[in-house]
Amino acid sequence: MGLPMLLATPVMAKEVVKIAFVGPLTGGVSNMGLGGRNSADLAVRLRNENPKSKYSYELVAQDDECKPNVGVQVATKVAADKSVVAGVTHYCSAVAMATGPVYNRFGMPAVVWGAVLPDVTYGNEFKEIHRVNGTMINQNDVAAKFMTGLGYKKWVIIHDTTDYGKGHNKYFSEFLQKSGGSILGTFGVTADQQDFTTELTKIRELKPDVIFFGGLTPLAVRIRTQMDKLGIKAQLEGTSGIKSDAYIQGAGKELAEGTLSFIEGAPWEKLPGGLFFTGKYSQQKYGESAEAYGPFAFAAANLIMDAVEKVGPDRKKVRDVLNKTKDVDTIIGKVTFDDHRQNIVPLITKYVVENGAWVVWEESSYGKGKRKLTGL
């Protein structure tokens, strides 16, 4: 009697779903874009390793160069591609502002992972635009109250003249005045400015306690190094836009020491999911750090994939699921979108550079009273 024939059951290949990542992969803030891309890539890799996943995911990365015109071009490219269901989009606020109408026109849901200008979500009624990170309003409220609470009284503000920089100037100035600080002068500089001798010479004469900088890492490095050359001893505090390894590398460990930055959300590296993220990120041996906003890109990609798993790769259905996001656990904490699809961020974390690394203020020697900031 012959053996019965065994028929192999074919394994059906999973449908491939494309997700776009858009950020600055080249240029002065490419470190942030590459960290964001790697983090979104990690989310996709981990999801594809999950046998319970209904779909196979592919990340389509595009470089917006942190330039609005380029951002519109690449946003149009991915949004016009119907095989791309949604996007993890933008670190630079000016780019996020320019591309919102594009995603709205094509009906492609986008989850912003780094841009902090409030109007990205609050300045429109685009149901396609969501944001997992907080806004500069939160940052500047804390930045002003914290520094006046330490005893500082006199400020000079330097900001870049993009929407990002002007927004930080607006909100920080308002909160500082409410907190009792005085502004001796405000200086707008271009985003690609190299020489700050004119501005810093005037600032040296004003003798501020603190220089507040509203801009991104490349300018912060130049300003900090040129402050030193001109003998300016003021304390430097900046926005989340300078919290990067590139700032410390560019300014050097000695000059970067004591610089302050404020970023929305709990310290992700202290959350259980953050430890998981750090371990998995290290295993992939990416050539770049995840940087401050990498975890937000990771969370954004996972929110999109969760929605696809629930309703399938349909843009409108995915958008509607994202719009109803409430108390979803992520590595950045619980995510809840308000009626403008803005994540409600409960707190701002204060960071200071100590011994060549960004350290949570409360855990630093400065926060513990063992070291003092400039002028205290």
Label every model-predicted segment.
Residues L7-A13:
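Sec/Tat signal peptide C-region and signal peptidase I cleavage site
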Residues A13-L376:
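Extracytosolic ligand-binding ectodomains
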